[in-house]
Amino acid sequence: MKKALFILNILATCLLLTGCNNFEKLLKSNDYDVKYQAAMQYYNENSFSKAIQLFENLTLHYRGREHAEEIAWYYAQALYQEKDYYMAGYQFKRFARQFPYSERVEEAAFLSAYCKYMDSPAYTLDQSLTKEAVEEFETFAEKWPRSTHMPEVNRYLDEMRVKLMKKDYEIAYGYYYIEEYHAAYESLKNFLNLYPEAPMREDAMFYLLVSGYKYAINSREEKKRERLQQVVGDFDRVIGSLKNDKYVAEAQDIYNKTRAELAKMEK
């Protein structure tokens, strides 16, 4: 067996040294043992692009056989080294599903989440990938709470939660900016419930009050009283938290106008 492996290694090395034409022949070859040895050698020599092509070629042939775990692992690792985080994350997640009892499963789960973290865009862009990364890291923390990766996991989670908070505020304020006051009101209310310690909390409270007032004042008559009363309640809840003098003055003005409108409706 050792002699056979030695011969395979020699053959793989010869193929590596004879250039591109022989690499194409290697890809088309049906000698999967030589392909496997060559893939590992390419990986160990940091020729990740060629290793990826060979591992991809080998995956189906070795499914359920000897070397299947090694191929799946190093395929994902080669993609990771090439910074193809989307495909690497997919392969690490697949590895964790296919080899749940492997000693590498914890690392695979971590790297699956980490790849999504690396692909997570700026908060101004769509945050679907960020949410997926958060979910995977939270699942990882539940399953391996004593992992050596936990300091990193907590740091990445904090960073991504800030990003999601900024995105949620941007969306809520965006509704206010385009004068969709009902949507702005609901979004800002949800934001304040979700992020009680947000640094932009004062801004959110102020725009909530303004949105609620503008939505109420433009409502149909049968709904106006109820919505104006809601504005009064919102004022009472937020006024003590407003520190910005401009916000306080405008909030007081909204309150006075709301009270005046309600008094007029009583007549």
Identify the role of each PLM range.
Residues 4, 19-267:
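Acidic, polar-rich low-complexity tracts and alpha-helical solenoid repeat scaffolds
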Residues 1-20:
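Sec-dependent bacterial lipoprotein signal peptides
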